Amino acid sequence: ELCETVAGLMHAEKGAILYKKENIVGKSPREIIKMGISMSFIPEDRLGMGLVASMGMTDNMLLKSYKNGKSPFINKKPARELALRLIDTLEIVTPGVTTPVSRLSGGNVQKVLLGREIESEPQLLITAYPVRGLDINSSYTIYDLLNEQKKKGVAVLFIGEDLDVLLELCDRILVCLLYTSPSP
């Protein structure tokens, strides 16, 4: 829920979330973008919230950029080129850019999602359990991508459970605990 709240997908009951001294609580993703904050969100549910499972890589690339077009027609060529570049640079194993992403392994699905989101050059990258269920090689690829973003000055909000990973990747760690008092 923390990631969704920061991304503007859920409303906070109280408090403030400041990004560059601007309170973003209660703002929709569109309003946050209008404030000049470019962000990307890697949700925990990769195929439910992040990508459209029945679509191929090219069409999933378009989800982030189709509104930027100047025409009512969609030019798929840049999205296809991006998909091919991501396959090459992230070593995504897929039969092709039109293969539904639901047919890819979990690690490859995560590479598609993270690659698309990083390509938009966000100032803020929000990730929820980005390596959950992935093999060790895919996990290290994801860690490397996140570290590259951090080196570029991107603010990375990393939600995770593995303390060793958190200590290695994070500059600051916040421990959150949901506590409800027992009923009498």
List the predicted regions and their residue ranges.
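ABC-family nucleotide-binding domains
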Residues: 128, 135
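Conserved small/polar residues in nucleotide/adenosyl-binding loops
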Residues: 179-184
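H-loop/switch region of ABC-family ATPase nucleotide-binding domains
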Residues: 160-161
